[in-house]
């Protein structure tokens, strides 16, 4: 949108606000007070349209049972059409309190205990937890990594599907932590055709769909056509607009038989809807948050280019994966830190809270860290300078 910008991007110091990223480090790191670059939420105030909508609802003074307005669905439908060229129908949309909850439920709906479920590692670690916690057989097909450039090993992917009689594939699109925005031929001619041939269900986690840079373009999995009977996608306003605490996401199910399976499951568990504040926040964000998102993407891009340039100059053998999408930077530090010393060096010497590589699929990724760039330039500078000051060539 051209003209005078009314929206501003406001950094918020979230320390001492019951913020998990800054105030909840004890559980994952065994201590507090680290410089936080881990949990995937932002340190930016949300769009003013969200604040205004929530303020108006709060000031109504009544928070009883909530009827979900058509405008909630329409705001999302309009967003998908305008930003991704994809026409979603209201009757396809189901509620989940979060993308993670959604794929946990879908695991239970679409598979049985001990069924094999495949993922592309390194991958968002709740995928791994979901498979294990639901007593399914976790199958990992590693992405190919050529000096930080990630691609799909389709031969390995298909072989593991056939060898293990895989029943379900959980796709991360865009991919966390590798930062890939998959091209249409990769998902359709690759993943989806293989899954069709072997009767494998697909859950497509598209929570980072709006966080895409440069000429890259997110392809909604369901927009590729022909796979509705084996595919469900999950999206949310939470990553895009920094409202994860509102606990509101959308499960998109075009196929009537899959809708029936989902509906029967949630009725049996009496999870029929979310809380009113989540609906209000998500509706407002999708309806009015576009200008704010543009500012966020510009800031993340600036932060990434700074990190990339500084490390190229000061730690030239660190491999920074290209950031096509997400605001999460995946960095290989094996030239400077032994994998078994990574946590000691990064946490104790650098005093950083990052997501450690082994969380994303095991020891073979222990030389990596994932850093969250959805924060102020100053915070990124602190993190980068801590790495430069404490890492030396092995």
Feature locations, PLM:
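Short, Lys/Arg-enriched N-terminal segments with co-localized hydrophobic residues
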Residues: 1-5
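PLP-dependent enzyme catalytic core of the Aspartate aminotransferase-like
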Residues: 336, 345-353, 360-394
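Conserved active-site segment immediately N-terminal to the catalytic lysine
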Residues: 198, 215-238, 258-264, 352, ...
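Conserved core of the PLP fold type I
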Residues: 63-193, 210-224, 228, 232
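Conserved core segment of the aminotransferase class I/II
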Residues: 52-53, 227-301, 309, 391
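N-terminal small-domain helix-loop-helix segment of the aminotransferase-like
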Residues: 7-98, 105, 285-288, 394
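Conserved glycine-rich beta-strand-loop-beta hairpin in the small C-terminal domain of fold type I
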Residues: 283, 300-308, 320-333
């Amino acid at each position: 949108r051209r003209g005078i910008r009314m929206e501003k991007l406001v950094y918020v110091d979230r320390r001492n606000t019951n913020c998990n990223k800054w105030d909840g480090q004890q559980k994952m790191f065994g201590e507090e007070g680290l410089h936080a670059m881990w949990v995937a939420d932002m340190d930016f105030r949300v769009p003013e349209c969200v604040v205004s909508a929530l303020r108006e609802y709060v000031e109504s003074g009544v928070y009883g049972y909530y009827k979900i307005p058509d405008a909630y669905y329409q705001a999302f439908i309009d967003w998908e059409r305008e930003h991704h060229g994809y026409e979603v129908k209201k009757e396809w949309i189901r509620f989940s309190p979060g993308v993670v909850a959604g794929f946990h439920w879908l695991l239970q709906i679409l598979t049985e205990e001990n069924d094999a479920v495949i993922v592309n590692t390194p991958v968002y670690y709740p995928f791994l937890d979901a498979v294990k916690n639901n007593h399914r057989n976790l199958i990992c097909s590693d992405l190919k990594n050529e000096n930080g450039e990630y691609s799909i090993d389709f031969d390995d992917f298909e072989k593991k599907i056939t060898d293990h009689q895989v029943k379900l594939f959980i796709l991360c699109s865009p991919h966390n932590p590798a930062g890939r925005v998959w091209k249409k031929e990769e998902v359709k001619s690759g993943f989806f055709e293989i899954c069709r041939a072997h009767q494998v269900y697909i859950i497509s986690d598209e929570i980072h769909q709006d966080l895409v840079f440069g000429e890259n373009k997110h392809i909604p999995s369901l927009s590729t056509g022909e796979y509705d009977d084996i595919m469900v996608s999950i999206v949310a306003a939470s990553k895009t607009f920094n409202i994860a605490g509102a606990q509101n996401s959308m499960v998109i199910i075009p196929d009537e038989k899959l809708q029936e399976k989902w509906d029967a499951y949630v009725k049996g568990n009496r999870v029929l809807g979310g809380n009113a504040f989540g609906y209000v926040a998500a509706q407002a964000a999708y309806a009015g948050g576009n200008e704010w998102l543009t500012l966020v993407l510009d800031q993340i891009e600036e932060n990434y280019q700074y990190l990339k340039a500084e490390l190229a100059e000061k730690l030239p053998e660190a491999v920074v994966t290209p950031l096509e999408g997400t605001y999460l930077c995946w960095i290989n530090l094996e030239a400077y830190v032994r994998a078994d010393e990574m946590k000691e060096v990064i946490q104790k010497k650098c005093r950083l809270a990052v997501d450690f590589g082994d969380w994303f699929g095991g020891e073979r990724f222990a030389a990596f860290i994932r850093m969250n760039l959805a924060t102020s330039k100053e915070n990124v500078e602190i993190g980068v300078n801590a790495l430069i000051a404490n890492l030396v060539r092995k």
